Regions:
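Short, positively charged patches
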Residues: 1-137, 141
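A short, small-residue-rich loop immediately preceding and capping a beta-strand
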Residues: 145-146
């Protein structure tokens, strides 16, 4: 079985949460396949997971993860995981880095770039939208990635 299926399973089971430290998961278990096969005892003594998360990890059905992976292959989408050499190294600086990146296009755009995230309200004022547009245009013209 492709190791990416285990990463997809882990992302699906745990979901996206700020209480999950993916850096601790990878530091302790190394990869998603090792975590999958470690079992509940090891999950508990690792100190990485709370009881609710351990309960979720006990759902070891890989069917949904396999279907997601197969859909990605069918559509020529890349699945990039932390154990891939082309996983963006800058993401490892985050304590809660993504377990799977779903890529449609060229992932190289993330390498050696200044990256900026612009966060705002769903209903910005006209002035703040204008400022955000001007800032993002200036950053991208200078070679940055938003």
């Amino acid at each position: 079985m492709n190791d990416r299926v285990y990463w997809i399973w882990l992302q699906q089971v745990l979901g996206i949460s700020t209480s999950i430290r993916t850096d601790e998961i990878v530091a302790y278990f190394g990869n998603a396949k090792a975590l999958y096969h470690a079992g509940e005892y090891e999950w508990r003594i690792s100190g990485v997971f709370n009881p609710r998360q351990i309960s979720k990890l006990n759902n070891q059905d890989l069917t949904k993860a396999k279907n997601i992976f197969d859909s990605c292959v069918k559509n020529n989408w890349q699945t990039v995981t932390p154990d891939d050499e082309n996983y963006p190294s800058m993401l490892f600086r985050l304590p809660n880095f993504p377990l799977v990146l779903y890529v449609n296009g060229d992932l190289d755009c993330l390498k050696n770039k200044i990256t900026v995230a612009i966060v705002g309200t769903r209903e910005p004022t006209r002035n703040s939208a204008c400022i955000a547009r001007a800032l993002s245009a200036s950053i991208t013209r200078s070679g940055g990635l938003i």
